[in-house]
Each structure stands twice: as C-alpha cells, then as structure tokens.
Amino acid sequence: MGGKVYAMDGLKIELKTNICLVEKCLRLVSYSNHSLYWNDPTEDCVWNCLARISRFHYPTLSLVSKGFRSLIASPELEATRSFIGETENHLCVCLNLNKNNNYNPRWFTLSPIAKQKLKSIPWHRHQYPKSSTVVANGSDIYIVGGFVCGTSSKRVFVFDSRSHQWRRLHDMRLPRVSAVVNIVDKKIYVIGGYKPRNIKDCGEVYDPNTQTWEPLLPTTVNLTIQNCVVSGGLVMGGKRYTTNGTKMNTCFVELENLLLGLSETYRDLVWRELKEDVWRVVRGLEQLSHNQNFTYVGNSGGGRRVAIWWKSMVVFRPRGRSHSTKKCKTEIWCAEISVERRGLGELWGRFSFSFRDSFIYIFLWEFF
C-alpha cells in the first residue's frame, strides 16, 4: 500500500491504494450489518480503494471477514472497476491434482503479471465432477452434469470468475454425463449425455429469464444447435466448423476470422480460415518443443492473442536423500502468443514476452 508490501495470510500483496483508505475500509466492513451506499463520498472512496486491488488477491481478501466477502461479490465493486478503468482479464484453469489415482480437481486463477503462481479459487464440493461439461460465457463458468458420488447428475453450477462466488442453477430435467453444451443467445443448450427413451430426452435448453429447463426437440431447434452432436464437427459461438479428419484435442479458440487449435497430429498450434477446411501450422514458434504435452489453448484478453498451456514431468533427486531416491514433479507452463498474417496462407506467432524471462513456471504437485 502506498509503495509498501504487506503480508496477509502468508501471501505478500502490494496494493496501489492509500493505506488510510484501506484501514478505513477495514473499519467499515468490521460491522457485519453495515451496508455501503453510493451517495456517501467517504464510502465512495472505499469502493474506489477496493476497485484498485487486483482480482488476483480477492481470494485472500475474502478471508478477512464476511463483510469483505460481501463487498468483493457486490455488483457495485465491478461497476466501480469499470468506471475507473481497472478492468482485468484472468485465466482460469481446473487441474486434477490427483495423488495415488484419487480424483482431486481444483480451480485456479493466473495473474496477468508474469512469473506469478496460480492462486487457488475457493473450494466447492462439486466444482468439477467427473465427466461433467464446462462452458464459459463472459465471466461465468458453467459446470454441467457429470458423476456425483458415482451417479449421473442433473446439477448445474456456475462460477463467477470476477467475484469468485459459486451458485447453483435449477436442476436439469434429466441427469447427463459428458453432454454437449453450447450457449447461444444467452440460453444454455444441452444435448446428449443420456440414453433417450423418447424424443423429448435428447436435449434441453435453459432460459435464464424464466430460470426453467425445457425439452429441446429436433423439430423446434435450428440446424446449428443440432450439429453440436454431429461426429467430426465443432460448434463455437453459434457456428459449426469441421475438423476435416485432423486429429485434434478438445481445445479450440475462435480469433477474429480465424480458428486455432492444438493438433495431436502435428503437436503444434494450428489454424484455419473460418470458411475453409485446411489446417496449417502457425509458424515462428520453433522454441516450443514438439515433445511437449499441450493441454489447452484459450483466448487471452481479446485481440489476436492466445494462451497455451502444457505440462511436463521432471525427475529429480531430493537433497539429503540417497542417489537411488528419485521423485517426479509436474510442471505446468503457460505462454501468451500473438499471431499475425504474413503473406497469403501464412500465420506467424510470436511470444508477447521474452521466452526465457516471462514463461510462467508453476510447481503444483509431487508424485511419489
């Protein structure tokens, strides 16, 4: 605060705001029944103060008190951030930190500041059930269906990546596992994941205005939504694309008039025109090893930028142990890449920061 660095719950947090305003904020939120109003200039300063704190630190601040958790989740805070130009884009990732083959999914956010470690998102009991489907819409991340306690589930949870709050939607009509989910015109379309007994069981749609699920009949839905379940096809943003036989993983991103994905065939970042079926390798990324286990590609804050995630296994000998003792740790890496056209049929990528200095190294887990 004011150029100083303070430690909170073991984490060092550097705040850009004046220490007096933060202390006043702490005093205000100490009253559990206290509410803040925009018409009080002093309390406007409090909102202004909190809005200048990076969202990356919200999980730590939420531990201060219930009052702080309420403030961080409030729409007034987001409105203030937008008004003063302190909006941020964060990457969210779910990692299975399994040990001894025990399923252990955890959500994390990654700070836009280079070389920052992942910060854990508040734990939720059903934050990523096995075989559930995840889809994002704006700042909301939807977790649909999956197995809960070994049984297929009707549940749908929503994680607000801005406030770090979880909420639950009304249950689906039927339990679904590994369903296809797409959001079109703010409605959630869910298809498959259930062996239908009749035509009404094929899919359903959630209307946020009425907060109800309705059957999705093939005769009442447009062809774009139906094509979600066509083998070898892909639907993003209400449009359908084909993979044209290229073996891809499940990660694609639409970038302006381009479609980018991670190819298991070439072990590279590949691209294609939206109106074409030919996949090409993005050039200029020779620093990326073809032996890397790429896991995800996603949009990185707008423009022609993508973020690529991958993991690697490192074997090492702990200090003080015998030479025969070895451990294996998983490293999760992330790089931000900007792409640009150079000539006809060529797309070049470059790292938005130094390959050596700004790659993000995160030590997550040790496997014995």
Curated annotation (Swiss-Prot):
SMART domains: Kelch. Keywords: Kelch repeat, Repeat. Residues 35-84 form the F-box domain. It comes from the Eukaryota. InterPro entries: F-box/kelch-repeat_ARATH, F-box_dom, Kelch-typ_b-propeller, Kelch_1. PANTHER family: F-BOX ASSOCIATED DOMAIN-CONTAINING PROTEIN, F-BOX/KELCH-REPEAT PROTEIN SKIP4. This is Putative F-box/kelch-repeat protein At5g02995.
